[in-house]
Amino acid sequence: MEARMTRRPFRRDQLPDPASYFADEGMTLTGQGEWRSTLCPFHPDTHPSLRVRMDSGGFRCMTCGAHGGDVLAFHMQRYGQGFKDAAQSLGAWGAGR
């Protein structure tokens, strides 16, 4: 009998919302509007230099240049995980409806 692989897809809609994700990471976001500021975890930081976009989780550090398009990219960089491992960590891999 032939073994069958079950596809366990990535589910972008299952990623946590940026406000919840960054709060759970212990990061305090300050400011108003579409972009917020916080300390950057990718370098020693004493003044908030990381900007986070609240609709997508996109981020950019104005000091070290770290950047990405969503909370998944942030998680991958912060914890050194690949795409699949980070998606699994965030509950967005293979989650079915």
Language-model segments: what does each one mean?
Residues 1-97:
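N-terminal structured subdomain of primase-like DNA metabolism proteins
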